[in-house]
């Protein structure tokens, strides 16, 4: 049975696999749509996927093991929080640079007190914009730390995990992220797959 990989396929694939079905997760990015179709909808897409599966040419995605998805998704959430943190730091840097000409490092911004903000930006509206961003930054930092603490309790110290950390710049969290995103490398029979 083939299922198209969409943003919400987990529940369907898990339920069907739990019921004993053998699943193929169709990779829509790798599927060429049939040019002769005059219109497409879910029914015609399903028929097309069934034909590809029947002929043995359905491009497939990897069904990541159900038990490992929560920690991978938690690491993805961490990455998203870090992106938000970076966006907030850049926003504060830009406000300060535009209004004072001062270039402050990310670490300096993260450690600023409200008094320092008001001393640097005497305009109340500008100070409020920076203060708001700093409040969000502190919240994001706290949540990133919470997620990292949880991830550290779930680390699996495999030889590959240890090897990854020998690369400069790769610590425990990034090594775990790489391992969780790549999954089991044995699923690739040859280099380039």
What is the predicted role of each segment?
Residues 75-163:
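Glycine-rich, often acidic, oxyanion-interacting loops/wings at catalytic, nucleic-acid
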Residues 167:
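Histidine-centered phosphotransfer motif of kinases
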Residues 176-190:
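Catalytic palm subdomain of template-directed nucleic-acid polymerases
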Residues 50-51, 94-97, 180, 193:
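Generic alpha-helical structural context detector
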Residues 9-13:
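Short, well-ordered alpha-helical microsegments
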Residues 17, 24-76, 80, 115-119:
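Short alpha-helix plus adjacent loop in nuclease-associated cores
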Residues 1-6:
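Short glycine-rich phosphate-binding loop at a beta-alpha junction
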